[in-house]
Amino acid sequence: MTVHEAIRQSMRPSERRRNILKRLTQEPFASVQELQTLVGASEATIRRDLKRLAEDGALKRVHGGVERPEAQTSRLTGAPFSKSLHIRTPQKRAIAKAAAALVENGETIVIDGGSTTYMLCPFLAELDLQVLTNSLPIIDKLLASPRTRLLVPGGEVFREQNIILSPFDEDGTAECYASKMFMGAQALTSAGLLQADSILIRAERRLMERAEKLVVLVDSSKFSRRAGLVLCPLGEIDIVVTDSGIGAQDRAMLEGAGVKVVIADV
């Protein structure tokens, strides 16, 4: 056995999967046999890795191998950021202001990309903060605040949503610890917090693991939506900040799951 073969056979699962995905950034298709040679693993091991990556939406399994999903490499589902920014703007701004009141000076926080979370920025300008965010507009906005230290994950830029997402397990955020994560949602239902895309869900799960508490910012229209993929059950949410349009049944649903509800003044 050569030194290179020994190194390949000692790869951890995360390293194998990272190399598989890296190969798919270079070529649109890779056979199982090619990937076996690439990472020095058995066919059974490779197929387990491919099954996991396919379930996460990072690749598409086809006859004889895998290919990168074209829809994923070009765009995400859902309204572009520039359009979302101008929908229910008064409610989003009020929700962001109420959510910003939960932030304490000196904290490390995570802000997930989105039109409502973007509106947090002006309310945080006077605080000493360390902020981990995957949002290019949030990065741009907070760059003007010298009191904010910015951390950014590695990955690919999705231009319509203006966010950075990575299919890799190791995106540079593993050592970060935050007291709170602030994020929006496609919808909130009894099933939990829903988002539109599997790659978005995978990236957001990694960000959620970096934070002690999860704060969700949603306007009341999000409670009437039912489409999407479940990111997490309601029990994993600590606080929901919304507007007074939330119905009594939806509020009871959240509070029954142990979620604190904060109503913003619009």
Walk through the language-model features, giving the residues of each:
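Glycine-rich N-terminal segment of FAD-binding domains in flavoprotein oxidoreductases
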Residues: 113-115
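HTH-adjacent hinge/linker in prokaryotic transcriptional regulators
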Residues: 2-33, 37-44, 48-110, 121-126, ...
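Conserved phosphate- and dinucleotide-binding cores of soluble alpha/beta proteins
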Residues: 2-22, 29-34, 40-42, 54-55, ...
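Glycine-rich SAM-binding Motif I of class I
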Residues: 118
